[in-house]
């Protein structure tokens, strides 16, 4: 597992819930890949998780990965909270179901394939990778908005 991949992720939503997009910038050696997508009715947190999930899914082999996110929800959820959620059968300490459990479960399944370090970065603070991921997420969100406009 010599390969090191750096990933920047972001999510964007027009309303919460509303049309949303996710984006990720993957960097490996001197190569970069940009990916993005959208959902017509979603939340900002779902888009944040989806960005990380889709970025990890695109990796073809086990890698050392650094994931940068400006979402404390994503970073804390995957590094701290998820262990108790699993122990409590995807319920929080107050016995309420974990929001977005479907995506958390899929993201958790991807963790075993890689060695991952999760890092939080301040959003909109001149971090070029975060800025690129934000632009991709906005592109996804705008695509969703255009589709909804066409549907009338």
Swiss-Prot record:
Entry GO terms, CC = cytoplasm
Q: Does the keyword Hydrolase apply?
A: yes
Q: Subcellular location, in the record's words?
A: Cytoplasm
Supply one GO molecular-function term. Answer: nucleic acid binding
Residue span(s) of domain RNase H type-1: 1-142
Q: Which catalysed reactions does the entry list for this protein?
A: Endonucleolytic cleavage to 5'-phosphomonoester
Enzyme class comes to hydrolase
Q: For Mg(2+) 2, which residues are the binding ones? A: 10, 134
The cofactors named for this UniProt entry are:
Mg(2+)
Record text on cofactor binding: Binds 1 Mg(2+) ion per subunit. May bind a second metal ion at a regulatory site, or after substrate binding.
Q: Which SUPFAM superfamilies match?
A: Ribonuclease H-like
The protein's Enzyme Commission number: 3.1.26.4
Q: Out of the domains of life, which is the source? A: Bacteria
Locate the residues binding Mg(2+) 1. Answer: 10, 48, 70
Its function, per the record, reads: Endonuclease that specifically degrades the RNA of RNA-DNA hybrids.
Its family remark reads: Belongs to the RNase H family.
Question: What is its quaternary makeup?
Answer: Monomer.
Supply the name of the protein: Ribonuclease H
Its lineage opens with:
Bacteria, Pseudomonadati, Pseudomonadota, Alphaproteobacteria, Rickettsiales
Q: Which gene encodes it?
A: rnhA
